[in-house]
Amino acid sequence: MATTTAGLTDLKFRVVREDFADAVAWVARSLPTRPTIPVLAGVLLTGTDEGLTISGFDYEVSAEVKVSAEIASAGSVLVSGRLLSDITKALPAKPVEVSVEGTRVSLTCGSARFSLPTLAVEDYPALPALPEETGVIASDLFAEAIGQVAVAAGRDDTLPMLTGIRVEISGESVVLAATDRFRLAVRELTWVTTAGDVEAAVLVPAKTLAEAAKAGTDGNQVHLALGSGASVGKDGLLGIRSEGKRSTTRLLDAEFPKFRQLLPAEHTAVATIGVAELTEAIKRVALVADRGAQIRMEFSDDTLKLSAGADDVGRAEEDLPVDFAGEPLTIAFNPTYLTDGLGSLHSERVTFGFTTPSRPAVLRPAGEDDGANGGSGPFPAAKTDYVYLLMPVRLPG
């Protein structure tokens, strides 16, 4: 819980600059750009015998981090989060000394000195308590999985169901999914449940979850708290706890689209190619395409031809070797969405699965048996823990 007692105003501490700057920056990232009340733009600094706690809260998202510091005098103070973040990032690599003097905060680092106004700490809301822990996952796996699906999440706040990541929990199995209507990313993984036989599905803001996932990589494990038993998700809150950090976010009250029916069970054609060479070629060819315009992909037995542009803006083509099976195929995609998908695979090679040029294509990490298959379809969709489904762009004519 955050301390909001008005009497604690004589805070004084000394802290390592890098630790302080990193902690303030992490908390400040969750602060609202346009706070509904002035105090929500602040970060709360609280010093106790246990060290320094830095926290922020805007009624939607909370963030709290503990930092090792020499506390000369316990107390708490509220200051502008973004200003403090900018200052601490610019300080020299020397110890930082902070003290409260009346209604101002004095900050000294080497020969640099700052005097900042304080905000009304007594008006600052208490941070919400974390729900009961639901499960634990390795921090690097958590960060990778969230990053792979967050790339497909929508950014239009008028469509809240598309700005979230759907988290489906079934015992030790977790499925993450996100879509913006043009692409869909789905990742399956396992974790250690600490709340018994859990069956639940919640929708978490993608931006907040992605930030929390990146922050959790400095520890060994990430603890997720949604409640236990029948209460999972009922608080409308997700809590995330990792090494010295904890955060909460309100769940989205929206219905995520039914996505499993979009994943084809078989393909009429498949193609396998190196991710790096394809990505670089797409970037080159797309230089003549207007922003958001299409890049065409023509697949034949052993060649992929990339092309883009028109006579009035310029044309570009590039041929790449490819392992292809099925009838020759021409399909077009938004180049940005395509490279986003390739980058999220975390694989040296990608396998495309096609049905028709007007239907979504599936991108997945290539398996050992992919490539140089030959033959004709249909080809059953391979089992994989990650898929990126991408809508094509209508071809001219």
Curated annotation (Swiss-Prot):
GO biological process: DNA strand elongation involved in DNA replication; response to antibiotic
CDD domains per the UniProt record, alphabetical: beta_clamp
A GO CC term attached to the entry: cytoplasm
Annotated protein name in UniProt: Beta sliding clamp
Similarity section: Belongs to the beta sliding clamp family.
Gene3D superfamilies cross-referenced by the UniProt entry: DNA Polymerase III, subunit A, domain 2 (3.10.150.10)
Subcellular location: Cytoplasm
Single Gene Ontology MF annotation: DNA binding
Lineage: Bacteria, Bacillati, Actinomycetota, Actinomycetes, Mycobacteriales
Source species, domain of life: Bacteria
